[in-house]
Amino acid sequence: MRSSLQETTPATGPADSSTQAAPGANLWLLAGGAAMTVFYLATSIYIAAHRPYWFDEIFVVRIARLPSITTLWTALGHAADTMPPGYHLVMRFWCKLFGYGEVAVRLPSALAMIAGLLIVFDCARRLTDSLHGLIAFALLTCSLLPYYGYEARPYAFFFMLSALAFWIWTCTPRDSKWSAFWFGAVLGLAVTMHYYAVLNIVPYLLWEITRWKPGKRPSPKLVAGVIGVAVVYAALSPLAMSFSRGFSHGFWAHPSLYALREIFPELFPDGLFLFAMAMIWAALTRMPGRGTTAPEMQPAEALGWFFLSIPLAGFVLAELRTNAFLPRYFIGALPGIAVAVACWLWRYSRNAQRLSMGILLLLAAWGAVTQAMTVRHPGTIDPFGQQTALKHYLKLEEALHSDGKRYILLNNPMLHMEASHYSRYPEEIILMLRSDGDEDLPTVRVQVNLSHYSPMRLWKLNDLEQHAAETALIDPTTETVEALKRAGFDVKFRFSGPLPVVYLQ
């Protein structure tokens, strides 16, 4: 039986025997791949252990701790989080077994990232050889992917499932009903991790459309994939619509031509630099007199390049419907792109192993150095500066208690979640809301929604009036200070920085 991409051209197998690496070289390549695997797993765990949770991750922990799956589903149905329930359910069962510590909660992401990297390696290896399979692996370590290997969020799972779907499409029999079933199931499962995973079907649709002929029926895998995505999204649409109605119009990362232009540099932050270095190496290793005619592009490579269309489809979706456009939403494009690059390089350099080996060393070294820098300074991972703010707050806690303050009121919604989680006095941490109840910050509104299911303290101005003398207001905005003065409060700055603290009378 043939794989899904073997219908068009026979050039889908690995390199011929004349271009295969020697057995000894293959052993070294496999050893190198094993070393990279261990390195990224170990360093991801180390980084996970040396940085606190931040806002999004604390939401994951709080939702995992909800009393029942019914409560979890109800909370998501009332816009308590942006994500579908798949990842939350995984974390709920995982955390019941292994606890809620930073390493335990982040470990599934590290494992999913490693699994996805190995799937991409195997896929590229089958289509080319072990050397170029490792190039696909190493290229991904130079993308935004490693960051999500130590974050308790669903993006590593999103990546892994996208890689698995690509592997099933390219490396299993075309007409197998079981292959079609698993392809549809994996794409559907990806949608339970992130709503934008519906876009994973786009490159496969483009592949079949560009090769369609009158009378030709869609492949079983494509039919199964469309059904899998459609059925799961239809089941989850009430949850998605609940969040969309409340937040899409004011979402902070809206689509724009500038944002679209920045997508690929965000997916591969050092991509242009690495490309320049690779081209310099290609010029240095050019061997005159050797044949340079490249074989025809493999169908799998062409499919991989179609993964570049996922952010474009996402831009259209964001403009027409969701108003949400962030690079991490397209992490599912990475497996196809990595395999396409490996296949392209194999076609042009399979008679020049030194060129490919140099590019592998460049990518592997750059990814490893970048990861090692993060290992040395995990504190540099500071989304929106909130982890620095958290450290400043925790240093102030005892001084506030010594001053008799028993109500710690935070104006910053992200800091509120983090302080609530790490404070020695979590029951005293309170988020300040607007008196009119018209909250415009999504980070406030999701906390208000979640507060119906997960205990947290929220105050308005009238609550503050009853406990002003025992309250410390942390990091207030200028608008908040002016509003308090207009309300008749005597505002005094106890600490001016790095985290301002206001006492009230």
Protein language model annotation of sequence segments:
Residues 27-505:
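Terminal, non-globular segments
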